[in-house]
Amino acid sequence: MRKLTLLPLLLIITGLLTVQAAELHFQVFIKGYNGTAELGIFGENLSKVETVKNGSIISLPAGNYTLTLFALNKTFVKDLRLDSNKTVTFNLLFTNRTENLSMMRHAIVQPSLEVFEIVLITNSGGENFEGDLAIPLPEHTGLKISDSSLSFLDFSDLNGNLTLKKLIVPANSTGEVSITYRLVKPKLSLSGAENQTVLIFTTLPVTNQSNAAYRGVQQFKGVDYSVYQCKTKCVLEFKVEPEIKIDKTSAFVILTASALIFIYLFTKRGGWEK
């Protein structure tokens, strides 16, 4: 008889636990947009779409979710760890002004005059950037974009600039674009760009320089690289020597390590919010 009376009690407890698990909620706030939007919610055992507006409250079981908000013909993505009642803010404010954008460039010039470069683009403003961004390049051939964590519609390689068209850089964030190209002669000459810093790594002897500061030597996998830094117009001329083969993977490992050091130092001084 006792076993029979325990069954309803267990069902009640299970029901209460289920209700408690579903009691967590998050509230949606949308900056810069007053209409309705479609919110996709994707979890381990749940997938649904809700129509939301600024201030909407969504109840869900505790867990990890990916949220996709579709508005203004764009999709905004956020990750949510729902372990307590929370708020989620989507920033739909946009600008095409570039004063809050800065570029930190890390480039390896190989003995073959092939250049591997990672361009870190930081938006330190409170609005998302959407527009065209020109990246000055030296005289080159064979430009390729090998990877990008940022979204852009197209690009052009004209008048000494790589122009990323309809580039989107979220507010208070940093993304990267990886490119390769080949110098047409042993000379790297960059025109000025606002809020740009360039670190250049090379094993080639530098025979002449202008507006470039020597930053010493960094060693990667037993190879010594001379490091130069410039911000405005700068020129480095190289003495071409017998080629030392450096595979592309190793080159990007070097650049990524350098870029990560920059990101670490930048975040330590409070460069952007996460």
Curated annotation (Swiss-Prot):
Q: How does it sit in the membrane?
A: Single-pass membrane protein
Q: What GO cellular component entries does it have? A: membrane
Give the signal sequence positions.
1-21
List keywords of the entry alphabetically: Membrane, Signal, Transmembrane, Transmembrane helix
Where is this gene product found?
A: Membrane
Where does the UniProt entry say this protein principally localizes?
membrane
Residue ranges crossing the lipid bilayer per the database entry = 249-266
Its protein name is Uncharacterized protein AF_2114
